[in-house]
Amino acid sequence: MTISRRAFLQTGLAVGAGAKLAFAAQTRPLLGLIAPPADYPIPPEGLALYDSTIRFTVVGLGLQTMTPAGYDSVIDKIVPAALELKKRGATAIDLLGTSLTFYRGAAFNDKLLGDIRKATGLKATSMSTAVVDGLRAVGAKRVAAATAYNEEVNRRLNTFLGESGFEVVAMKGLGLEAIGDPGKVTQETLQQFSADVFKQASKADALLVSCGGLRTLEIVAPLEKETRVPVVSSLPHALWAGMRLLGLRVKAPGYGRLLANG
């Protein structure tokens, strides 16, 4: 079989282009995610927002219940998980799990991040830090919070937000505890629930939807339209904070004010 020079050159160009694309993909920043569940995939929200810009790698902690006892059972796994992410080549670390990082207060969240940075030498943020950064970025002071949590975890969130400089004017949770249950909440149910919580608030200037397991990306913009205030939610804005940690600002219009601004 004889291959023409033109075909040979075309094949070589195609192989070369493919190799360049593969090399480019491998040189994109790698954001390491520490996730509460044991088997946590790369979040679809991350792929939808930033797949062309960065890569993701995930280590799960094996959290079973969203309760203080559940969080206590995995808290010592966080630094080893961060070290595993460093071994994989992570450029920075994003500690997911809003309640996992706020349940002992703002100072403990800061300590967790300090421990990760000291152990790995990498930049790090957490989901709780991300929602605080998001609320501050939109100028929030009086916050309504719709959550996945039970009353005890809500009480701790209230304390954390107060320590972070916000006044909580309304808060209500879905009462969920099993780690997989937030993902079963439909977006229609969650949007209505969140809007109802906001309506209970007295002059809230922002709405927080708290829990990384809730699927919130597609409801942020509709909620902002309905409530006429900025909406911050756990997973999308943790990914937003992770991008900023990497020194990147990628605009993602259609998903609310913060993501649209990058």
Please provide the spans of the model-predicted regions.
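N-terminal glycine-rich anion-binding loop in soluble enzyme alpha/beta folds
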Residues: F23-P80, E152-N154, N158-T186
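Glycine/small-residue-rich loop that forms an oxyanion/phosphate-binding "nest" at active or ligand-binding sites
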Residues: T101-T120
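Periplasmic-binding protein-like
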Residues: A90-L96, A144-A145, A204-C211
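Short, flexible loop segments at boundaries between secondary-structure elements
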Residues: I179, V231-R249
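Short, well-structured alpha-helical segments in soluble
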Residues: I75-R88, Q192-K203
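N-terminal secretory signal peptides
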Residues: M1-I3, A7
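N-terminal export signals
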Residues: A7-A24
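Hydrophobic alpha-helical
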Residues: Q192-E226, S233, A238-L239
